[in-house]
Amino acid sequence: MKLVIAEKPSVAMSLAAVLGATERKDGYLEGSGYLVSWCVGHLLELAQPEAYKEQYAKWRYEDLPILPENWKYEVPKDKKTQLALLCRLMKDKRVDSVVCATDAGREGELIFRLVYEYAGCNKPMERLWISSMEDAAIREGFDHLRPGSDYDKLYDAAVCRAGADWLIGINATRLFSVLYGVTLNVGRVMSPTLALLVQRESDIESFISKPFYVPEITCGGFTASGEKMTERSEAEKIRMDCDHNSAFVRSVEKQVKTIQPPRLYDLTTLQRECNRIYGYTAQQTLDYVQSLYEKKLATYPRTDSQYLTKDMQATAASLILWLRDNMPFGKGCAGEPDIDRVTDDSKVTDHHAIIPTVEIARTDLTELPSGERDVLTLLAVRLLCATTQAHRFETVTAMLDCQGHTFTAKGKTILQSGWKEVERIHRMSIRQSETEHRENEDAALPVLKEGQTFETVSASLREGKTSPPKHYT
């Protein structure tokens, strides 16, 4: 009999349903040769300093640094019952092997291994490593369980990360708190991140906005701009020189440019995009996509890859076709899907990019919580964008001369909307303002030729102020 240990109850229930372990027991499920139980997050945590020496209970400068030779762990009071159950199940004579089915990542490995070692278990250990909670993916994963030893280095990395956090957090927090007489929390990741925020805030507060002036001429239905100036008098002189005088086109440069489709989402890029579009925090996005994963609607979220593996191409192709036919933004796609563009086995380590699963075709999205619906929709949009045509446009840069002064006019003509059409339809569906996407875009220019003359131009002065750095989002 195999003992399967998941990271949380909801995942255990999904695994048990596929495995046929349907008989409910106190803290686990049983059936078809399986016992399926769960952790509740971390059941063991690194002990506080006083667990090593009683004198460390008091924060004193002379005790620093605190450097344990061997790590000690403690069990949170609210998790003792579940830990005791798992220890008992591991020692159950019916169990001949244990399957680590915690999240397929560094922290999931740590959660399971600490329990396995705490229980003193020496039964064979296997690893379930899947990127989707779909039934088919679960079956495939259990058909190809991997030796637990394959992930020893992943466990070592998790222990190192936890230890580094403890050493820096405990010692630096105590040091600065003692020196300054007030509790100052210091963390390995938190403190440098906070330093970036403080520096940016300082830059914003100390920023002194300065005015600038740009002489412009309007001729033939378009506007050309001169050099940005800090002295109004200089800009005004140019305006007066040019107003109601003639101008001619000195040069016209045309260039066709291509913007390739974006890559699929890894967790970081998904969090960044959800913050930009919806204002969700990184934690909110992670919570939403984790819930989608557990509902079998999205693949594993904690990934740093933006590519798929070759064995996913057939599934991805059918999913893309369904999205094109059934989602409003799907009509923005053109041409055959280019799945090869998002496929690269060499760029996938533990998990592939985050995409929807085929379960989306059997789900009423209106029944999902709004945050989950937003994230799932964004995953679908990105999958279509990444596999449709490139965005192509022609830029035109015209240099004009008016009374010896140089002016520049820029324009852009869309040749092929490509993936940006999918994005545009999605933006309209969520009523996102088009202004923020078009404010930096150039309108199309009329046809211009070198030497072309405009007999009378209208000159004006555009005023503005320099802007401070933006806050981080």
Residue ranges of predicted features:
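Extended, well-ordered alpha-helical scaffold/bundle regions in very large, multi-domain proteins
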Residues: 280-348
